[in-house]
Amino acid sequence: MSDHVTRRLRIHGRVQGVWYRESMRLKADALGVSGWVRNRMDGTVEALVQGPFEAVDTLTAWARRGPEDAEVTAVDIAEESAPPMGRFEKRPTA
């Protein structure tokens, strides 16, 4: 799995109430990326994304824009290691 990568993303800005999580789930599914996305109580969106480097890089670039109604101001990115994950899912707010 050396060509695979796992990243934790924290997305800041107007990213809740704009279909960010569902849009990210659809984009991740289209790219073949595994993981999850959830709202955070502080108003950010958090995601753990895993898959081939190029696909994760494409999803990370998408996260900087988000869906049409989002206004992303920053994305914190951390490389992580994690066991293989299944399909991409929306999780409850944490």
Regions found by a protein language model. Give the residues of each.
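Intrinsically disordered, low-complexity, mixed-charge
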Residues: 1-94
